[in-house]
Protein backbone atom coordinates (compact mmCIF):
# COMPACT_ATOMS: atom_id res chain seq x y z
CA UNK A 1 0.00 0.00 0.00
CA UNK A 2 1.51 3.31 -1.03
CA UNK A 3 1.59 6.40 1.15
CA UNK A 4 -1.42 8.14 -0.48
CA UNK A 5 -3.62 5.04 -0.22
CA UNK A 6 -2.70 4.68 3.43
CA UNK A 7 -3.44 8.35 4.04
CA UNK A 8 -6.93 8.20 2.53
CA UNK A 9 -7.90 4.89 4.14
CA UNK A 10 -6.91 6.08 7.59
CA UNK A 11 -9.10 9.16 7.28
CA UNK A 12 -6.12 11.41 7.89
CA UNK A 13 -6.59 13.15 4.56
CA UNK A 14 -10.13 14.19 5.46
CA UNK A 15 -9.03 15.44 8.87
CA UNK A 16 -6.20 17.37 7.24
CA UNK A 17 -8.65 18.89 4.76
CA UNK A 18 -10.90 19.99 7.62
CA UNK A 19 -7.98 21.58 9.47
CA UNK A 20 -6.88 23.45 6.35
CA UNK A 21 -10.46 24.68 5.84
CA UNK A 22 -10.64 25.85 9.46
CA UNK A 23 -7.35 27.74 9.12
CA UNK A 24 -8.50 29.36 5.88
CA UNK A 25 -11.75 30.49 7.53
CA UNK A 26 -9.88 31.90 10.52
CA UNK A 27 -7.52 33.80 8.23
CA UNK A 28 -10.50 35.19 6.31
CA UNK A 29 -12.11 36.31 9.58
CA UNK A 30 -8.91 38.04 10.64
CA UNK A 31 -8.67 39.85 7.31
CA UNK A 32 -12.31 40.94 7.65
CA UNK A 33 -11.72 42.25 11.16
CA UNK A 34 -8.72 44.31 10.05
CA UNK A 35 -10.56 45.73 7.03
CA UNK A 36 -13.79 46.55 8.87
CA UNK A 37 -12.09 47.93 11.97
CA UNK A 38 -10.05 50.30 9.81
CA UNK A 39 -13.16 51.44 7.94
CA UNK A 40 -15.19 51.95 11.11
CA UNK A 41 -12.43 53.68 13.08
CA UNK A 42 -12.79 56.86 11.03
CA UNK A 43 -16.57 56.86 11.56
CA UNK A 44 -16.69 55.55 15.11
CA UNK A 45 -18.08 58.74 16.65
CA UNK A 46 -20.94 58.84 14.13
CA UNK A 47 -21.70 55.15 14.62
CA UNK A 48 -21.72 55.53 18.41
CA UNK A 49 -24.14 58.45 18.08
CA UNK A 50 -26.73 56.09 16.60
CA UNK A 51 -26.87 54.13 19.87
CA UNK A 52 -28.98 56.82 21.48
CA UNK A 53 -31.27 55.23 24.05
CA UNK A 54 -33.63 58.20 24.23
CA UNK A 55 -34.14 58.28 20.46
CA UNK A 56 -34.61 54.51 20.35
CA UNK A 57 -37.20 54.59 23.15
CA UNK A 58 -39.16 57.25 21.28
CA UNK A 59 -39.02 55.25 18.05
CA UNK A 60 -40.15 52.02 19.74
CA UNK A 61 -43.01 53.88 21.46
CA UNK A 62 -44.14 55.27 18.10
CA UNK A 63 -43.84 51.87 16.40
CA UNK A 64 -45.96 50.26 19.12
CA UNK A 65 -48.59 52.97 18.91
CA UNK A 66 -48.89 52.35 15.17
CA UNK A 67 -48.37 48.59 15.24
CA UNK A 68 -50.58 46.27 13.22
CA UNK A 69 -52.30 43.83 15.61
CA UNK A 70 -54.20 40.69 14.69
CA UNK A 71 -55.35 37.75 16.79
CA UNK A 72 -55.41 35.31 13.89
CA UNK A 73 -53.93 32.75 13.91
CA UNK A 74 -52.43 33.82 17.24
CA UNK A 75 -52.18 37.28 18.82
CA UNK A 76 -49.32 39.06 17.05
CA UNK A 77 -47.90 42.50 16.38
CA UNK A 78 -46.08 43.86 13.36
CA UNK A 79 -43.99 46.91 14.24
CA UNK A 80 -42.68 48.94 11.33
CA UNK A 81 -40.01 51.64 11.53
CA UNK A 82 -39.04 50.10 14.85
CA UNK A 83 -35.73 51.92 15.26
CA UNK A 84 -34.46 55.31 14.16
CA UNK A 85 -33.27 55.01 10.56
CA UNK A 86 -29.66 55.76 11.50
CA UNK A 87 -29.70 53.13 14.25
CA UNK A 88 -31.10 50.52 11.91
CA UNK A 89 -28.46 51.32 9.27
CA UNK A 90 -25.72 51.06 11.89
CA UNK A 91 -27.02 47.66 13.02
CA UNK A 92 -26.99 46.44 9.42
CA UNK A 93 -23.32 47.45 9.31
CA UNK A 94 -22.74 45.39 12.45
CA UNK A 95 -23.80 42.13 10.79
CA UNK A 96 -20.54 40.23 10.43
CA UNK A 97 -19.35 38.72 7.14
CA UNK A 98 -20.47 35.20 6.31
CA UNK A 99 -17.26 33.59 7.59
CA UNK A 100 -18.27 34.47 11.14
CA UNK A 101 -21.30 32.19 10.88
CA UNK A 102 -20.85 28.42 11.43
CA UNK A 103 -20.65 26.61 8.12
CA UNK A 104 -21.79 23.07 9.01
CA UNK A 105 -25.22 23.80 7.51
CA UNK A 106 -25.12 25.69 4.18
CA UNK A 107 -28.67 27.09 4.43
CA UNK A 108 -29.24 27.62 8.19
CA UNK A 109 -26.63 29.47 10.24
CA UNK A 110 -26.88 31.11 13.66
CA UNK A 111 -24.49 33.30 15.62
CA UNK A 112 -24.68 34.05 19.33
CA UNK A 113 -22.53 37.01 20.27
CA UNK A 114 -21.19 35.40 23.42
CA UNK A 115 -19.89 32.49 21.35
CA UNK A 116 -17.83 34.65 18.98
CA UNK A 117 -14.17 34.31 19.85
CA UNK A 118 -13.32 37.11 17.43
CA UNK A 119 -15.44 39.76 15.74
CA UNK A 120 -15.13 43.23 14.23
CA UNK A 121 -15.22 45.90 16.93
CA UNK A 122 -18.44 47.47 15.63
CA UNK A 123 -20.15 44.08 15.42
CA UNK A 124 -19.40 43.43 19.07
CA UNK A 125 -20.27 46.96 20.23
CA UNK A 126 -23.57 47.25 18.35
CA UNK A 127 -24.83 43.75 19.09
CA UNK A 128 -23.90 44.08 22.77
CA UNK A 129 -25.93 47.30 22.87
CA UNK A 130 -28.84 45.50 21.20
CA UNK A 131 -28.66 42.56 23.61
CA UNK A 132 -27.86 44.41 26.82
CA UNK A 133 -29.80 47.66 26.41
CA UNK A 134 -32.38 47.69 23.62
CA UNK A 135 -33.91 44.25 24.10
CA UNK A 136 -34.05 43.97 27.91
CA UNK A 137 -34.43 47.65 28.73
CA UNK A 138 -36.69 48.96 25.98
CA UNK A 139 -38.33 46.29 23.85
CA UNK A 140 -39.17 43.62 26.43
CA UNK A 141 -41.03 45.87 28.91
CA UNK A 142 -42.92 47.58 26.10
CA UNK A 143 -43.90 44.32 24.39
CA UNK A 144 -44.97 42.72 27.66
CA UNK A 145 -47.16 45.70 28.51
CA UNK A 146 -48.86 45.42 25.12
CA UNK A 147 -49.22 41.62 25.00
CA UNK A 148 -49.79 40.77 28.67
CA UNK A 149 -53.62 40.72 28.29
CA UNK A 150 -53.22 37.77 25.90
CA UNK A 151 -51.09 35.67 28.26
CA UNK A 152 -52.84 33.22 30.53
CA UNK A 153 -53.33 34.50 34.08
CA UNK A 154 -50.66 32.32 35.67
CA UNK A 155 -48.06 33.33 33.10
CA UNK A 156 -49.02 37.01 33.10
CA UNK A 157 -48.59 37.23 36.86
CA UNK A 158 -44.95 36.13 36.75
CA UNK A 159 -41.97 38.40 36.06
CA UNK A 160 -40.51 37.94 32.59
CA UNK A 161 -37.15 38.51 30.94
CA UNK A 162 -35.64 38.29 27.48
CA UNK A 163 -33.49 35.32 26.61
CA UNK A 164 -30.10 35.69 24.98
CA UNK A 165 -30.91 35.91 21.30
CA UNK A 166 -29.26 34.85 18.10
CA UNK A 167 -28.46 36.41 14.76
CA UNK A 168 -29.81 34.16 12.01
CA UNK A 169 -28.67 33.80 8.41
CA UNK A 170 -30.84 31.82 5.99
CA UNK A 171 -30.16 30.95 2.35
CA UNK A 172 -31.97 29.35 -0.62
CA UNK A 173 -33.10 25.82 0.20
CA UNK A 174 -34.01 26.67 3.79
CA UNK A 175 -37.38 25.35 4.92
CA UNK A 176 -38.75 25.31 8.44
CA UNK A 177 -42.05 23.50 8.91
CA UNK A 178 -44.90 25.03 10.97
CA UNK A 179 -43.97 24.77 14.63
CA UNK A 180 -44.30 26.29 18.08
CA UNK A 181 -41.31 27.23 20.19
CA UNK A 182 -40.65 25.47 23.53
CA UNK A 183 -43.51 25.85 25.97
CA UNK A 184 -41.43 27.94 28.39
CA UNK A 185 -41.53 30.78 25.81
CA UNK A 186 -44.32 33.34 26.20
CA UNK A 187 -43.48 35.60 23.25
CA UNK A 188 -41.33 35.04 20.20
CA UNK A 189 -39.75 38.18 18.76
CA UNK A 190 -38.16 38.52 15.33
CA UNK A 191 -36.27 41.64 14.28
CA UNK A 192 -35.95 41.68 10.51
CA UNK A 193 -32.55 42.86 9.29
CA UNK A 194 -33.60 43.27 5.67
CA UNK A 195 -31.14 45.15 3.51
CA UNK A 196 -32.00 47.41 0.57
CA UNK A 197 -33.03 45.21 -2.33
CA UNK A 198 -33.83 42.11 -0.27
CA UNK A 199 -36.87 40.15 -1.45
CA UNK A 200 -39.77 40.88 0.90
CA UNK A 201 -41.36 37.51 0.04
CA UNK A 202 -39.02 35.62 2.37
CA UNK A 203 -40.94 36.54 5.51
CA UNK A 204 -42.51 34.59 8.35
CA UNK A 205 -45.51 32.38 7.67
CA UNK A 206 -48.25 32.15 10.29
CA UNK A 207 -50.47 29.05 10.47
CA UNK A 208 -53.70 28.15 12.19
CA UNK A 209 -53.97 24.77 13.94
CA UNK A 210 -57.18 22.78 13.64
CA UNK A 211 -57.62 22.09 17.36
CA UNK A 212 -56.03 22.83 20.74
CA UNK A 213 -52.75 21.07 21.39
CA UNK A 214 -53.10 18.55 24.19
CA UNK A 215 -49.72 16.80 24.06
CA UNK A 216 -46.48 17.82 25.74
CA UNK A 217 -44.48 20.44 23.86
CA UNK A 218 -41.59 21.10 26.20
CA UNK A 219 -39.33 21.29 23.16
CA UNK A 220 -39.95 22.79 19.73
CA UNK A 221 -43.25 21.28 18.61
CA UNK A 222 -44.24 20.42 15.03
CA UNK A 223 -48.04 19.95 14.98
CA UNK A 224 -48.17 18.06 11.68
CA UNK A 225 -45.94 15.35 13.11
CA UNK A 226 -48.61 14.70 15.74
CA UNK A 227 -51.62 14.58 13.44
CA UNK A 228 -52.67 18.23 13.62
CA UNK A 229 -53.68 20.14 10.50
CA UNK A 230 -51.96 23.47 9.87
CA UNK A 231 -53.31 26.03 7.41
CA UNK A 232 -51.34 29.08 6.34
CA UNK A 233 -53.15 32.28 7.24
CA UNK A 234 -50.67 34.99 6.25
CA UNK A 235 -47.07 35.91 5.57
CA UNK A 236 -45.41 38.77 7.41
CA UNK A 237 -43.27 40.34 4.70
CA UNK A 238 -39.52 40.55 5.18
CA UNK A 239 -39.30 44.34 5.26
CA UNK A 240 -36.54 46.59 6.61
CA UNK A 241 -36.68 47.82 10.20
CA UNK A 242 -39.67 45.62 11.02
CA UNK A 243 -40.36 43.41 14.03
CA UNK A 244 -42.81 40.54 14.36
CA UNK A 245 -43.91 39.57 17.87
CA UNK A 246 -46.34 36.75 18.53
CA UNK A 247 -47.81 34.67 21.32
CA UNK A 248 -46.27 31.21 21.46
CA UNK A 249 -49.56 29.34 21.49
CA UNK A 250 -52.72 29.07 19.41
CA UNK A 251 -50.91 29.09 16.07
CA UNK A 252 -47.69 27.99 14.42
CA UNK A 253 -45.02 29.75 12.40
CA UNK A 254 -42.74 28.70 9.57
CA UNK A 255 -40.29 30.09 7.03
CA UNK A 256 -38.90 29.15 3.64
CA UNK A 257 -36.50 30.40 1.01
CA UNK A 258 -37.06 28.30 -2.13
CA UNK A 259 -34.10 26.59 -3.74
CA UNK A 260 -34.90 28.48 -6.94
CA UNK A 261 -34.28 31.86 -5.26
CA UNK A 262 -31.20 33.69 -6.57
CA UNK A 263 -28.02 32.10 -5.22
CA UNK A 264 -26.92 35.34 -3.54
CA UNK A 265 -30.13 35.52 -1.44
CA UNK A 266 -29.46 35.94 2.27
CA UNK A 267 -32.06 36.55 4.98
CA UNK A 268 -30.82 38.08 8.23
CA UNK A 269 -32.96 38.34 11.34
CA UNK A 270 -32.41 38.54 15.08
CA UNK A 271 -34.60 36.33 17.25
CA UNK A 272 -35.16 36.45 20.97
CA UNK A 273 -37.76 35.07 23.34
CA UNK A 274 -39.60 36.59 26.27
CA UNK A 275 -40.15 34.01 29.00
CA UNK A 276 -40.76 33.78 32.75
CA UNK A 277 -37.54 34.78 34.45
CA UNK A 278 -36.42 31.32 35.55
CA UNK A 279 -36.76 30.00 31.99
CA UNK A 280 -34.91 32.99 30.59
CA UNK A 281 -32.04 32.44 33.03
CA UNK A 282 -31.84 28.78 32.01
CA UNK A 283 -31.46 29.81 28.37
CA UNK A 284 -28.57 32.10 29.23
CA UNK A 285 -26.47 29.22 30.53
CA UNK A 286 -27.44 26.73 27.82
CA UNK A 287 -25.26 26.36 24.71
For the regions a language model picked out, list residue spans one by one.
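A short, polar/proline- and glycine-enriched secondary-structure boundary/capping micro-motif
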Residues: 101-102, 188-190, 216
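N-terminal short leaders/motifs
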Residues: 22, 26-33, 123-144, 218-229
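Catalytic core of Fe(II)/2-oxoglutarate
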Residues: 2, 7-11, 15, 173, ...
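Short, Φ-rich (hydrophobic/aromatic) sequence segments
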Residues: 36, 46-48, 52, 91-92, ...
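Non-heme Fe(II) oxygenase catalytic core, chiefly the N-lobe of the double-stranded beta-helix
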Residues: 96, 137-211
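Fe(II)/2-oxoglutarate
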Residues: 1-69
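Non-heme Fe(II)/2-oxoglutarate
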Residues: 66-147
Amino acid sequence: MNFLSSLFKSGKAERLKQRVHAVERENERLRSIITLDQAHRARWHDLEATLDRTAIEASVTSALANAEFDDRPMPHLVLRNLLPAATYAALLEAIPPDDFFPDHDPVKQNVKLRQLEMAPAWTRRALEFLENTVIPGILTPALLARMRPYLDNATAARPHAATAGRLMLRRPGYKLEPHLDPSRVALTCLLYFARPGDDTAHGTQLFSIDRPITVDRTNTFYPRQHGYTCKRVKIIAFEPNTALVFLNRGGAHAAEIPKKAPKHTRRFAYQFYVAPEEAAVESLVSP
